[in-house]
């Protein structure tokens, strides 16, 4: 696909859920561009539409109305199989609950999406090994998920997401099931991926993690109500810490 223009372009995207004749407006007119190599945080309270927006970006759901363009291609009229193909090649997912397959080893979990892409055995081995090395989990390749800590499982999930070299990484509360130490370790890994050129869109309700992005997009009741640079939020947070007698964040 062509890389000119924004990687992601949303114009007036709306999403309505219908249950028992009740309409729930999850998204009410989203306008959003994400550039190649950008790190964007989608922030807001529970129920504001963050995960719905991420599902649409990842082609797991379709908008009720509006336009979604990915890499200069409209996704509006794609068949289910076309959406699945693009999702497998263009998008890497990182979930809150890791979603690793329990009876597969670490290596097999990372390799599996590459198998679905029809890659040769040698190419799968190369990419899987590189992905595990990138997240510091190559030494655990033969272990099962049950033999890993939560932080280690999330690292494996990140390796699985980046192994296919996707155009964008979509992370849905990637620190939600982790303690603060492991959460910060995963966020540092995300920052390393971004410094390496990855395009990242992360959903989070935690301002400590949102502020590490290039740009923070605030959602409330299905609308973008504010955008700010992550650096601005970091400056505010550091000043608050200083006034409270603590050192600046790293």
Predicted regions and their residues:
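Conserved beta-strand-loop-alpha-helix hinge in the C-terminal portion
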Residues: 223-247
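ABC family nucleotide-binding domain
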Residues: 6-213, 219
């Amino acid at each position: 696909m062509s890389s000119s223009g924004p990687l992601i372009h949303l114009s007036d995207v709306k999403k309505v859920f219908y249950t028992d004749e009740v309409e729930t407006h999850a998204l009410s007119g989203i306008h959003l561009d994400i550039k190649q190599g950008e790190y964007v945080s989608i922030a807001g309270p529970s129920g504001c539409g963050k995960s719905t927006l991420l599902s649409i970006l990842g082609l797991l759901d379709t908008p009720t109305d509006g336009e979604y363009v990915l890499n200069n291609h409209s996704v509006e009229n794609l068949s289910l199989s076309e959406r699945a193909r693009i999702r497998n090649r263009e998008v890497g997912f990182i979930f809150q609950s890791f979603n690793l397959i329990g009876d597969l080893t670490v290596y097999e979990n990372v390799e599996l999406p590459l198998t679905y892409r029809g890659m040769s055995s040698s190419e799968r081995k190369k990419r899987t090994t590189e992905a595990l090395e990138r997240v510091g989990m190559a030494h655990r390749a033969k272990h099962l998920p049950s033999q890993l800590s939560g932080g280690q499982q999330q690292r494996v999930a990140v390796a699985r997401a980046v192994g296919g070299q996707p155009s964008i990484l979509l992370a849905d509360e990637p620190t939600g099931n982790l303690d603060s130490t492991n959460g910060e370790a995963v966020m540092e890994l995300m920052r390393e991926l971004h410094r390496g050129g990855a395009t990242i869109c992360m959903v989070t309700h935690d301002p400590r993690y949102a502020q590490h992005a290039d740009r923070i997009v605030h959602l409330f009741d299905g609308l973008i109500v504010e955008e700010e640079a992550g650096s601005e939020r970091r400056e505010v947070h550091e000043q608050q810490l200083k006034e409270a007698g603590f050192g600046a964040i790293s």
